[in-house]
Amino acid sequence: MYVKAEKFAQGGRSIGHLDDGRIVFIDGLFPDEEGEISIVDEKKDYCIATALSVALSSPQRRKSPCPFSSQCGGCLWIELDYDAQIQAKEALIEELFSDFPEITFEEPVTGPEFGYRSRARFQYTIRNGKASLGFCAESSNRNVEIKCCPVVDERLNDLIKNPPRLNAWELKDRELSCITTDEGVLYDDRTGWITVNDRRLPVSNKVFFQSNLILLPKLIDYVVSLTEGPKVMDLYSGVGTFSAFLEDRFDVTAVEINKACLSLARSHLKRTEFFTSPVEKWNPRTRQVNTVIVDPPRVGLDRKVPEMIASWKPDRIIYVSCFAPTMHRDIKRLKELGYEPQSLKVFDFYAQTPHVETCVLLVREREEDIDTVSIKVDLEGINIRQNKQLLPEKPTYEKIKVYVKEKYGFEVTSLYIAQVKDHMGLEKRANYNIGEGKAKVPNCPPEKAEAIVDAFRHFGMI
């Protein structure tokens, strides 16, 4: 089957159209390229395909610098010229946030496209008495043994060439998590230290820490430059990456649910006040705050958090995210609550992939700037039940599935949609959460829940 790729979709695949008009999401073709494809998943309204050959190649295509990229699948855009990667990421972000015309898109921050990752999770195997490291093949649990990886730190490549001999009890599910520190490479539970902007920060394989230590200082500097005091709240604070550079200038309160993160934060922060709590359940003693910084996981803010932050009436909110779709969802809600997104800056933390780190500044609208209009609606004589055209059409589960597939490139089930509806208190079908014999069924993965919530907003359900 021969297809032309038209543009990138959110998530990094290319979009094309089949002869019957259906959308096809393609791995292995870049925009304006043509080639033979193989359908790997077929639905009523769309398909997923992989390229078998490239007949008409883009001038932005290059030979892969990694001999394992075709098997590993971890670097979806490694055959795309780096300048073209940046342009594509900018275009995708601007498309996603196009419903905020007031946003200023600042110049993206870029860095080295190779050798930037300071941490990795390898698959560990022993064959013929010799240890080796690798990564999972794309959409598979199959291990791809590698001899090098162009995107990781040189010290991690040294580890790939000479992997340690470990006992089974030292591994978790045959995975080896590694992070480079000032002291060397850590692949156990010890604490190490990383120097960022002349300040030492604690890290370990048990907690999250940014993987791009080359661009992290620039992100920190940018966040600090946007912060106004005297009172600052650092929500989802982790090990205190931002608080470390704010506590000497502002009165900082940090909130983090992970006790291991807060333990590390307390080891180096002396002036910050800490709270161990889910952000959505935290009840601050004082609601006086000038700047709120949020750096949530991919799932974004809990649905209660935007209203909670808005009730404190901070002058500004700084939102940092590694997953722009959920950030967009949350900013849409924050705007409804009186916070206008002013600027957006992309940091290319993840070269060779479609992913970026994004920072948005939101500023509270002053009451005198808000125009109010009084509207009187005469409902006398109108029967809402008889005039269903007055109500928005209720989206079907199938429409939600198609929306998610077209925007995010993956599928969601009716079960997952029902679970998210249940979580949000929306009307749903019969209880999908209980299987035969009252057995519980799997919960919706966070990234799919994010996409479903976005679909709810798109269709006006929330």
Question: What is the predicted role of each segment?
Answer:
Residues 1-68, 140:
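Terminal RNA-binding accessory module
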Residues 4-10, 14, 181-389, 397-398:
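Rossmann-like S-adenosyl-L-methionine
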Residues 29-35, 156-158, 166, 170:
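Short nucleic-acid-contacting surface segments enriched for D/E, G, S/T with interspersed K/R
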Residues 32, 152, 212:
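Short, conserved phosphate/pyrophosphate- and ester-handling motifs at nucleotide-, phospho-/glycolipid
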Residues 52-64, 70-166:
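Extended interfacial segments that mediate partner engagement and assembly in macromolecular machines
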Residues 394, 443-462:
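Phospho-regulated, low-complexity intrinsically disordered regions of nuclear gene-regulatory
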Residues 396-408, 418-424:
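DNA-recognition alpha helix
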Residues 428-439:
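Short Lys/Arg-enriched helix C-cap and helix-to-coil transition segments
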